[in-house]
Design a protein with these regions (language model features):
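Short Gly/Ser/Thr- and Asp/Glu-enriched loop/turn motifs at secondary-structure junctions
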Residues: 109-113, 150-153, 293-297, 346-350
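Short, charged/polar, Gly/Pro-enriched secondary-structure boundary elements
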Residues: 122-126, 308, 359-366
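Flexible loop/turn segments at secondary-structure boundaries
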Residues: 155, 308-309, 360-362, 405-407
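C-terminal hydrophobic structural anchor segments
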Residues: 335-391, 395
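DNA-contacting surface of Y-family translesion DNA polymerases
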Residues: 6, 193, 201-347, 431, ...
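Short, hydrophobic beta-strand segments
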Residues: 115-119, 315-321, 365-370
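A generic structural signal for short beta-strands and their flanking turns/coil linkers
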Residues: 34-36, 76, 143, 294-296, ...
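Gly/Gly-Pro- and Ser/Thr-rich, intrinsically disordered tail segments characteristic of DNA damage-repair
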Residues: 1-237, 246-247, 286, 375-444
């Protein structure tokens, strides 16, 4: 393509990224964690998925199994937490709602990142406004964020990295307009750290002599496209200041929804597997109703540990007569599918369900052979159950078949309370009456 057609972008795209998000969520409600090394673990308390800066400084890598750092944990008194996804999801919603007050154009990119269009601002105004965003998010939610601003999404990612890694920028960095200054910055960014460059592509690029972002920017498109396709070409142009990735202000409808968990301990009985599959199906149905979607088919899968002998895995996909998001209908089909693929004599490590063929609940296709099908009563029941669980906490009302004790359930030995979503776990602030009187006295 003629380069004259590729115009430099004059947009001002800000990437707001929450700093050490999972750890920051824990610190909001437990200030004693400030300044201490903290790690958050993956499902079943297996591996490190989030680290405080203090933990990073100790050399603990992302994804390291917890058993490999037991000595370091004891030696440095590292605080260990299980993943509290309900808390993190709620805090994420609060951060994103705060960002929406600063711009009508916000793309929620992930649980802890968002792109915001600030193109109506320029120069010092941008720095001041970004600093205001940063201060307000922290005041309203307690979550520290970094802000990187640039003409394209990819350069905004680079700018955010600089804002986060260099304290002198006070959490805000504006990509310079001078191409020479941009190139100087890009020369210090490893190709491994560029947004959209995975392990395989980075390995190939390094073998080709492309080790940093500047070298990638200067690589001809004809060399990139055969290996990395149109995605690689867009990335290349974004590094050159040509905006190829628009903000996605409306999330794309999901094509599938999966709920699966590894078990705390191996499960060998059909009864316990039914409890797990029923639990996962219930959660998946809740997600569908929240997304206002219905599933046309459901896939059930089970598997044993890959690291043990006698490995077994199986799955089955069953269609629904009419696309549905109603828990009883989905449970019936899921249990039938499980019974068809279950095999005695195995110790299963994981089970899950995948809702497929998702479609909007208001335009789902009917079934010519089910003219008497009427889901009105079930829909009202689901709506009532959802409202009760939303008000009083998840699983206030649940299906008896999902079990009570659930010895197979996910290991979460260091789980923090549901501070923001469960009435019984809301933190209590204690203050003496004398302190109140002293405060009144100060006012007058």
């Amino acid at each position: 393509m003629n380069k004259n057609y590729l115009k430099k972008s004059h947009k001002k795209i800000a990437l707001i990224d929450c700093n050490n998000f999972y750890v920051s969520c824990e610190r909001v409600f437990n200030p004693k964690l400030e300044g201490k090394p903290v790690v958050v673990l993956s499902n079943n308390d297996g591996c490190v998925v989030a680290r405080s800066q203090e933990t990073k400084d100790l050399g603990i890598a992302m994804g390291v199994p917890i058993f490999k750092i037991r000595e370091l944990i004891e030696q440095h008194q590292i605080e260990v937490y299980s993943s509290n996804y309900v808390l993190y999801g709620d805090m994420s919603g609060r951060v994103m709602a705060t960002l929406a007050t600063f711009s009508p154009e916000v793309e929620i990119y992930s649980i802890d990142e968002a792109f915001v269009d600030l193109s109506w601002l320029s120069g010092d105004e941008l720095i001041q406004y970004a600093s205001l965003i940063r201060t307000t998010v922290f005041q309203w939610t307690g979550i520290p964020v970094s802000v990187g601003i640039a003409p394209t999404k990819t350069l905004a990612k680079v700018a955010n990295r600089i804002a986060k890694k260099n304290p002198q920028h006070q959490g805000v960095f504006l990509c310079p307009e001078s191409e020479a200054e941009q190139d100087k910055i890009l020369s210090g960014i490893s190709v491994k750290d560029i947004w959209g460059i995975g392990r395989q592509y980075s390995k190939w690029l390094i073998n080709e002599g492309v080790t940093n972002a500047l070298q990638l920017k200067q690589t001809p498109e004809w060399k990139i496209q055969p290996k990395m396709g149109i995605v690689g070409v867009r990335l290349l142009r974004e590094l050159q200041g040509v905006s190829c990735l628009e903000l996605e202000l409306q999330p794309k409808p999901k094509k599938a929804t999966c709920v699966s968990r590894s078990f705390r301990r191996p499960v060998s009985t059909l009864a316990e597997l039914k409890e797990a599959v029923l639990t996962h199906t219930t959660l998946a149905a809740e997600k569908l109703r929240k997304q206002k979607q219905c599933a046309a088919a459901i896939t059930i899968f089970i598997l044993t540990s890959r690291f043990k002998d006698n490995y077994y895995s199986n799955s089955i996909t069953l269609p629904l007569p009419v696309a549905s998001n109603l828990t009883p209908e989905l449970i019936d089909l899921a249990i039938k599918g499980l019974e068809l693929i279950f095999c005695e004599g195995y110790e299963f490590k994981k089970a899950g369900v995948i809702m497929q063929g998702l479609q909007p609940e208001n335009i789902r296709q009917g079934n010519l052979f089910l003219q008497d099908y009427d889901s009105t009563k079930l829909e009202k029941l689901m709506k009532t159950i959802d409202q009760i669980n939303k008000r009083y906490g998840r699983n206030t009302l649940c299906w008896a078949g999902s079990g009570v004790n659930k010895p197979w359930s996910m290991k979460r030995e260091n789980l923090s309370p549901l501070y923001t979503t469960c009435w019984s776990e809301i933190p209590i602030v204690k203050a003496s009456f004398q302190n109140y009187l002293d405060l009144i006295e100060e006012q007058f």
